[in-house]
Amino acid sequence: MSEETLSKKQITRLNKLQKRLRREVGSAIADYNMIEEGDTVMCCLSGGKDSYAMLDILVNLLQRAPVNFNLVAVNLDQKQPGFPEDILPAYLDSLKVPYHILEKDTYSIVKDKIPEGKTTCSLCSRLRRGTLYGFAQKIGATKIALGHHRDDIIETMFLNMFYAGKLKAMPPKLLSDDGANVVIRPLAYSREKDIAEYAELKAFPIIPCNLCGSQENLKRAAVKEMLKSWDKQFPGRIETIFTAMQNTSPSQGVDRDQFDFVSLKQDPDAPMKGDVAESDLPAFDFLDLANSGHIDLDAAKRSSDLLKIDVVSTYTP
C-alpha cells in the first residue's frame, strides 16, 4: 500500500490520524518542554512503526514549531543477520533529512552473553542505548528522541509493579544518570493502535524487529494482553490509568522516601475551627433523628436546628 493507491475513505482516515498524532505530539512537547530554541534533536530511527511515525511528525514540526531547532536522524546497525542496509538510507534520502547510519556489532555480544532461546531484548537495548548516548554527545545533540508511546509507558509501569516491586514507568523527559543527555519521548500521549494504523496507511518501509531470533518478552506480552482486555471490557480505563500517572500524591501513598511521614506532628498552635463540614468531624456519628440520616452542619445555623442533633457513642472519663 502507498499513499497514491489509498481510497478516499483511507485518505480521510489518514488525515484524521495525522492531525490527532501531530496534536498529541505537540501537546507532549509543550507540557514537558521537550524541545527548546536552538536544540539539536537526534531522532533515533530503528525501522519500526513507532520511530518512523515520530520522525514523520517531527519533520512536519520543523516547519511550524514556535521555536527553531535542528533534526538529525540516527540509526544503529547492530549487525543482526538479514538487516536490510539499503532501506533506511533510501527513505531518509527521500525526506532530505540529515542522518547518520552507525555500525556496531552488538549482536555478537548479545549472542555470547545470553543463552539460546532466552529473551535478548534487555541487553540489546542497553548496548544500543550506550552507543547512541555516546554518539549524541559526539555530534552535539541536546535532545535524544525515542519512539516510546503511551502504551509502552503504561506497560512498563505494570511490569515494574508486578515483577520488580517498584512504582516506576518511562518519563516523557529524562536526564541520563551522568547528566550528559536529555531523552525525550514525543509520542508519550499517543496510542499504539493509532500509530500502527498511521504507519500502515503511510506505507513506511518497516524493518522487522525480530531479525535476531530473540524470543518474545513473555512478561510484557502478558501485560499488553491484560491492558488490551481492559480497554475492550472497560472503555476509558487506559486513559484513566495514564491520567492517574500524571496526578500522583506522595503524602497519600506509603513511600517513605517520597514523603516525610516520620516527622509528621500535630500543630498545637493550629487555630480552632468554627463551623466545620461533616467530612472534618471526628470519628463519632452526628445523627438527625428526624430523618434518620446525616445532618448538614454547615446548613444548621439556627439553635433550633442544632437541637435536632443527637451525639452518640461518646465517652467522658
UniProtKB/Swiss-Prot annotation:
Keyword Hydrolase: no
PANTHER family (alphabetical): AMINOTRAN_5 DOMAIN-CONTAINING PROTEIN, SULFURTRANSFERASE-RELATED
Protein name as it appears in the record: tRNA-cytidine(32) 2-sulfurtransferase
Function: Catalyzes the ATP-dependent 2-thiolation of cytidine in position 32 of tRNA, to form 2-thiocytidine (s(2)C32). The sulfur atoms are provided by the cysteine/cysteine desulfurase (IscS) system.
Protein family: Belongs to the TtcA family.
Pathway field: tRNA modification
Listed EC numbers: 2.8.1.-
Catalytic activity of the protein: cytidine(32) in tRNA + S-sulfanyl-L-cysteinyl-[cysteine desulfurase] + AH2 + ATP = 2-thiocytidine(32) in tRNA + L-cysteinyl-[cysteine desulfurase] + A + AMP + diphosphate + H(+)
Extent of motif PP-loop motif: 46-51
Cited NCBIfam families: PRK10696.1
Pfam families linked to this entry: ATP_bind_3
Named cofactor requirement(s): Mg(2+); [4Fe-4S] cluster
Any one GO cellular component localisation term in the record: cytoplasm
GO BP field: tRNA thio-modification
Species name: Shewanella loihica (strain ATCC BAA-1088 / PV-4)
Misc: The thiolation reaction likely consists of two steps: a first activation step by ATP to form an adenylated intermediate of the target base of tRNA, and a second nucleophilic substitution step of the sulfur (S) atom supplied by the hydrosulfide attached to the Fe-S cluster.
Entry keyword set: 4Fe-4S, ATP-binding, Cytoplasm, Iron, Iron-sulfur, Magnesium, Metal-binding, Nucleotide-binding, RNA-binding, Transferase, tRNA processing, tRNA-binding
Binding, [4Fe-4S] cluster: 121, 124, 212
Cofactor binding note: Binds 1 [4Fe-4S] cluster per subunit. The cluster is chelated by three Cys residues, the fourth Fe has a free coordination site that may bind a sulfur atom transferred from the persulfide of IscS.
Location of the protein in the cell: Cytoplasm
Listed GO MF terms: 4 iron, 4 sulfur cluster binding; ATP binding; magnesium ion binding; sulfurtransferase activity; tRNA binding
Subunit comment: Homodimer.
Keyword Methyltransferase in record: no
